[in-house]
Design a protein with these regions (language model features):
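General secondary-structure edge motif
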Residues: 4, 57, 91-92
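Loop/turn positions that initiate beta-strands
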Residues: 10-11
Length: 134
C-alpha cells in the first residue's frame, strides 16, 4: 500500500512513544532547518490527564476538539520536537506512523498560543517556534 504523505501545518500523526501511540500535531509547514541541515517541522503531542499526576494545564483538549480525543488530555510542550520530513515520511510509508485527521483552526490556534505561555517549552523549541511557526 502506498500512502502519499506530506506533513503540513495543522496535520496530525500518530507516533509510538513508549508503549502507547500518541497524537502529535504538526505546527508548521516544512522549512529548511540549518541546525539539522534538512527540511523539518515542529510537532507537539497530546497526552492523557491523570488527576493524581501533575500536568501542564496550558492547553487542555476535550471531547469534540479532535476525533482522537476521548477524554481530557493536555499538550505536552516539554516534549515538543523538531522532526525531519524525510524520516517521518519514510516511517509513514513503512506503516510505522499513522496519519490522523487534521486539527481544526480554533484548536490549532490554542495549541500554538501555548508555546508562548507554557513554562515547559525548551529554549531551542521556543526559538524554532518563534522563527517558523508564528
Amino acid at each position: 500500500m502506498t500512502i502519499n504523505f506530506v506533513p503540513v501545518k495543522k496535520g496530525a500523526i500518530m507516533l509510538l512513544t513508549g508503549a502507547k501511540e500518541h497524537l502529535f500535531f504538526i505546527c508548521n509547514d516544512p522549512v529548511f532547518y540549518p541546525a539539522l541541515t534538512k527540511e523539518c517541522f515542529l510537532a507537539v503531542n497530546l497526552t492523557t490527564i491523570y488527576r493524581d499526576i501533575a500536568y501542564d494545564d496550558t492547553c487542555i483538549l476535550g471531547i469534540g476538539d479532535h476525533p482522537f480525543v476521548k477524554h481530557d488530555s493536555y499538550i505536552l510542550y516539554k516534549k515538543a520536537e523538531v522532526l525531519g520530513v524525510d524520516t517521518v515520511t519514510s516511517q509513514v510509508m513503512a506503516g510505522d506512523i499513522r496519519v490522523s485527521e487534521p486539527c481544526r483552526n480554533d484548536v490549532f490556534d490554542r495549541i500554538l498560543n501555548g508555546f508562548n505561555v507554557s513554562p515547559h517549552v525548551k529554549p531551542k523549541i521556543r526559538k524554532f517556534y518563534n522563527k517558523y511557526c508564528r
